[in-house]
Structure formats: structure tokens, C-alpha cells
Amino acid sequence: MNQTLLSAFGTAFERVENAIAALREGRGVMVLDDENRENEGDMIFAAETMTVEQMALTIRHGSGIVCLCLTEERRKQLDLPMMVENNTSAFGTGFTVTIEAAHGVTTGVSAADRITTIRAAIADDAKPSDLHRPGHVFPLRAQPGGVLTRGGHTEATIDLVSLAGFKPAGVLCELTNDDGTMARAPECIAFAREHNMPVVTIEDLVSYRQAQERKAS
């Protein structure tokens, strides 16, 4: 990742700390991955705090595929089958079947309906019957171990919201340009500045977590 672009957001450690602080304040975060991987930026939010306005922003400026990152434990609690048995996607992205809240939504497409679906899925006492399948929210199963196991946006989202003190559930969506192309680092950084989002890379988060583990041992 081009460090010149990122230097305005502090050191790698500071970028992670700023991301954690933003999530605690109810703001979104821009998470960039490696230029040699997907080379994209995802807007991420804590599932517990995401607002209808933030969802509307995400739908308006994102790919439209709004994903709810969950742990394997939560996936089992909700009895969500994986979308395919044999995952042949380039990065092994862990999509489950799509979901909709069983109650409190109309078509399920609006920002408010998607928030209702997310709240239903992350409720402490959530059960499979609280959700209909398919729907307009795309759950993603994170790998245990987070970014230290898999350097994906799914795991980064779970790691960041957990570090911020929230339950391990977060929302992500890839940022796109107005012409429909994928936003790359310069566009992602400009968007983040405009919308008061800190910028952090998955590489930053890997380093941060490795340092945490060294300290703990």
C-alpha cells in the first residue's frame, strides 16, 4: 500500500487506534486491502450502532451488496447454510444464504429494512425463525482468528468492531466510483476525508494484532 497516501492518517498503530475510536463514536471506517489482493476499500460499521442514514450512504456510494460479517458461532445459531458447498471464489469469501428480517420489513430493500434485518440477526436471543431466506442482506462468515488467519475485509471488520468493544458483527460494503468502477486507494481516501472516516489497512491491523499478541505472551 502506498504509504505516502496514508501518512496523513498517522502511523499504522495510530490508524488502527483511530479506527477503533471512530467505531466507538458510531462512525464508519474505510478499510483498504493490499494493492495485490482485491485492491479495494470497504466502508465498515459496527452492526450494533449503524444508522439508517449510514446505511443509505453505503447503498448510495457502494456496490449495493451490503454484507453482514458474522462469526461461525453466530452463523450456526442462525442456522445459515453457506451459499455454496464448494467455494471456488478467488479469495474464498464466505457468503451464506441471504437474509431478511421475518418481521418489521416491507420489501427488505430500503435502508431502514436492511437495518431491521441486521438488528434481527445480531440480537442476543436471535433464532433461525427470526429471519427469512433469501433476502437483501448478505451475511459473510469470518474465519476464526481474524486477520491473522485470513487477510480479508470480513475478518478485518470483525476484528475492528471487537477491539472497539462491540459484539463481533459488522457491516461492510465496497466503495464504488460514480461511473460504477471500483474505487481504488486514492478515491477511497478522498471519500473517507469527505465523510469523516478514518482510513486503515488490513496490513495495519495485522501488525497491530501481532503486537498485541506479543505483549500478551
UniProtKB/Swiss-Prot annotation:
The record marks 136, 174 as: Essential for catalytic activity. Its EC number is 4.1.99.12. Pathway: Cofactor biosynthesis; riboflavin biosynthesis; 2-hydroxy-3-oxobutyl phosphate from D-ribulose 5-phosphate: step 1/1. One of its GO terms (biological process) is riboflavin biosynthetic process. Catalyzes the conversion of D-ribulose 5-phosphate to formate and 3,4-dihydroxy-2-butanone 4-phosphate. It comes from Cronobacter sakazakii (strain ATCC BAA-894) (Enterobacter sakazakii). Its cofactor is Mg(2+); Mn(2+). Mg(2+) 1 binds at residue 38. InterPro entries: DHBP_synth_RibB-like_a/b_dom (IPR017945), DHBP_synthase_RibB (IPR000422). Binds 2 divalent metal cations per subunit. Magnesium or manganese. It is an enzyme of class 4 (lyase). Belongs to the DHBP synthase family. Keywords: Lyase, Magnesium, Manganese, Metal-binding, Riboflavin biosynthesis. Mg(2+) 2 binds at residues 38, 153. Homodimer. One of its GO terms (molecular function) is magnesium ion binding. It catalyses: D-ribulose 5-phosphate = (2S)-2-hydroxy-3-oxobutyl phosphate + formate + H(+). This is 3,4-dihydroxy-2-butanone 4-phosphate synthase. One of its GO terms (cellular component) is cytosol.
